[in-house]
Amino acid sequence: MEAIQTNETKMITTRPYSDTIIARIKREPKFARLLYASAINAILEGEAAEGLSILRDLVNAEISFKELARQTGLGEKSLHRMLNRNGNPTARNLGLIVKSIAEDLDIKPRVEFA
């Protein structure tokens, strides 16, 4: 939050949540990698809306939808729809998206068994 002082009042302005997250992703590469892991975990645990929303923030902060479209061969508008909270990407398209984001963040995913 940012305080703005005028002669008569003090007003608090806030930034939208996604803007705050995007700014932090740009500042902290480790935070971006943690968010990526959170997105994958959310999707695997059945929380697709949460996972897709996180992936969208990562794309907005790190890649851009135009570049993601180039990397995946998918349409930019289609990617926007797929990464919407109500998006429903196919398994193939989701795989292309998470692979491109991982490569852009220099992440090499691995599977561990508990």
Features from the language model and the residues they span:
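N-terminal flexible/basic segments that precede or flank functional cores
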Residues: 1-54
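Short alpha-helical DNA-recognition segment
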Residues: 60-81
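Residue-level detection of the helix-turn-helix DNA-binding "recognition helix"
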Residues: 84-85, 102
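Short, charged recognition helix plus adjacent turn
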Residues: 19, 108-114
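Residues that mark the N-terminal boundary/hinge immediately upstream of a DNA-recognition element
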Residues: 64, 90-93
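DNA major-groove recognition helix of helix-turn-helix/homeodomain DNA-binding modules
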Residues: 92-108
